[in-house]
């Protein structure tokens, strides 16, 4: 089910990441945390989902700024390549923002494929960016220019050097 921007989720009985904090409820609306407090009382009709998190810790999403989302490796040959990252791997690791980049393999993997994978993660509701460039000199880009890639492609926020 595709969630709207105003769907509310209530996490009950979780311990915030700060270990000194008592058990709290967390009210989320869309992508925003609205309230963190003990025993939040919201009319049931406004809540899309209630999750009992008793015994669980609520932590912020992690930002991983160096991920080979299209796969990695390859310097040892074709059998040495690592497969592309799956969204479920980000979920399992608690990563909510990712910056993808090419690794040593700028030949069988491309900036175009990297941008496409970044767009796919964004379409799935994650926050994803990527870096243009590769190990090679002159570096690989999508437009033929590092400056143009960064200027005109929204997902590209820098260059791998």
Which residues does each PLM region occupy?
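Short amphipathic alpha-helices and their capping/turn segments at secondary-structure boundaries
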Residues: 45-56, 87, 143-152
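Metal-associated gating/positioning segment near the N- to mid-region
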Residues: 53-116
């Amino acid at each position: 089910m595709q969630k709207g921007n105003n769907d509310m989720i209530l996490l009950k009985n979780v311990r915030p990441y700060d270990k000194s904090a008592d058990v709290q409820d967390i009210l989320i609306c869309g992508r925003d945390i609205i309230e963190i407090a003990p025993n939040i009382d919201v009319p049931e009709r406004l809540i899309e989902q209630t999750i009992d998190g008793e015994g669980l810790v609520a932590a912020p999403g992690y930002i991983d700024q160096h991920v080979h989302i299209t796969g990695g490796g390859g310097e040892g040959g074709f059998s040495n390549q690592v497969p592309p990252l799956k969204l479920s791997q980000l979920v399992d690791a608690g990563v909510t923002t990712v910056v993808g980049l090419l690794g040593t393999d700028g030949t069988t993997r491309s900036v175009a494929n990297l941008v496409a994978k970044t767009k796919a993660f964004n379409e799935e509701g994650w926050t994803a960016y990527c870096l243009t460039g590769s190990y090679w000199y002159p570096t690989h880009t999508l437009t033929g220019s590092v400056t143009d890639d960064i200027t005109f492609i929204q997902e590209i926020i820098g260059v791998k050097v």
